[in-house]
C-alpha cells in the first residue's frame, strides 16, 4: 500500500535527500524545506521504497502538494 507524503506548509525545496528506488526507514528525512528562514525536514511516516519524488530543489510548494510516494 502506497503512502503519499504531502507538504504541510508553503515552502521552498532546499534539498531532496532521497531518490526514487531508495529503501528508507520510518523517520528518515525525505526532503528539506525552507520557510521563513527556517529549515524544516520532511520525514517518512512509514518504512518502504520511495516510488516517486514529485519535487526538485528550488520548487515552491503549497500546503497539500505531493512531495513523494512511499510504497
Curated annotation (Swiss-Prot):
Modified residues (N6-biotinyllysine): 37
Gene3D superfamilies reported in the protein's UniProt record: 2.40.50.100
Keywords: Biotin
UniProt domain Biotinyl-binding: residue ranges: 2-71
Superkingdom as given in the UniProt entry: Bacteria
Identification of the protein by name: Biotinylated protein TB7.3 homolog
Amino acid at each position: 500500500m502506497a503512502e503519499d507524503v504531502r507538504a504541510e506548509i508553503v515552502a521552498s525545496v532546499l534539498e531532496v535527500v532521497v531518490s526514487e528506488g531508495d529503501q528508507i526507514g520510518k523517520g528518515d528525512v525525505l526532503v528539506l524545506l525552507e520557510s521563513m528562514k527556517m529549515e524544516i525536514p520532511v520525514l517518512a511516516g512509514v518504512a518502504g521504497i520511495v516510488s516517486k519524488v514529485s519535487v526538485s530543489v528550488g520548487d515552491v510548494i503549497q500546503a497539500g502538494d505531493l512531495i513523494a510516494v512511499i510504497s
